[in-house]
Amino acid sequence: MTSRERVLSTLSHREPDRVPIDFGSTGVTGVHVSCIAGLRDYFGLEKRLVKAHEPYQMLGILDEDLKQAMGVDVEGVSRPKTLFGYRNRDWKPWRMPDGLEVLVSEEFRVTTDANGDILIYPEGDMSAPPSGRMPKDGYFFDTIIRQEPIVEEKLDPQDNLEEFKPLTDADIEDLRQGVNEAQRTGRAAIMNVGGTAFGDIALVPAPFLKHPKGIRDVAEWYVSTSSRRDYIHQIFSRQCDIAIDNLTRVHQAIGDAVDAIFVCGTDFGTQTSAFCSVKTFRELYFPYYKTLNGWIHEHTTWKTFKHSCGSVERFLQSFIEGGFDFLNPVQCSATGMDASHLKTTYGDRVTFWGGGIDTQQVLPFGTPEEVHTQVLERCRIFSRNGGYVFNTIHNVQARTPVKNIVAMLDAVREFVG
């Protein structure tokens, strides 16, 4: 099987010749730049600096030689903009606090504050307040909350819609070119158009905007889902309309040349509980996901990707009814997320994309033998009758031992033959 055939087989809940593997196709299935550098050294690949394409989590680009060495079957397509609003182009070297030199966009602009922390600026505009902070001994950027005082009677949903706009012709062309490049790899393609996630808390503070208005504080947003529900409904309703208009234009440009679309990264689970009740999810979020995914399934062949960390078993039936085809990252370490239970209960109706290894404890802190054992067990559980794409539980974090990453890859290869 080709990589694409392998992925399409598992998405149709048929067992392929081996378990498909994804690393680097999305912002939630990626690898930290430091780990990519270590893997390149391990595999004896050409010496080159790693490109940090998403500074928020310091995720790096996996070049073709590394993808082949890792056995990657999925190719990502997205617009070349970062979470801090600047475009990836004209790469330049930059040294991280731990001394690792990487490549960043020419539009990447940072300063260092009195504490030694690194501040990053939206759209690379240093006349605007910084929107992200990397601690002096850190490995990625945290969003800086820039919440203006809230005057209740002046709240305007349009302020929280500033980032949801019609795609430009240049945006469409970026995606079209990306799709063409993905097709040439022979891998399955997953696309992220943007603007389709309702209430994604990573996006609420808008680190990509110079002067965000509306409700941008994380705690205030969660409070608003209860106390200002009409306000949130107005945002989601308009956002849904804009998203469908954008997807219509994208589909006109690329047709069914991609196999899946990243729809949503909104987290509904915590380690032990949830951010809202199922009732709140059904009332506030479900109608818009149902509408958006319904349009996708009616007008395209694209499969739909739902990311939600944490304990989300209680939401899975609603996710499925809302039109989601995949669940990621499948956080088996969270309460109620036992791998066998998930596969037995939902495995014929949803594809599990992730869950392959615990990135909180086992991958970063376990032994290679412990990594190997858990990967084989997860593959055995999740791959039965297809419906499984191997990935870690969320991104591979900084300081993860390369020997453990290699043990993980070796175990997947061993399982598949």
Where are these regions (language model features)?
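A contiguous, low-structure linker/loop signature
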Residues: L83-K154
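Residue-level detector of functionally special positions within alpha-helical transmembrane segments
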Residues: T2, G71, M96-G99
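Generic structural hydrophobic/aromatic packing signal, biased to beta-strands
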Residues: I21, K67, E75, V110, ...
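Segments that shape or occlude catalytic/ligand-binding pockets
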Residues: C35-G85
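Short, charge-rich binding segments
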Residues: D65-A69, L100-V102, G178-R184
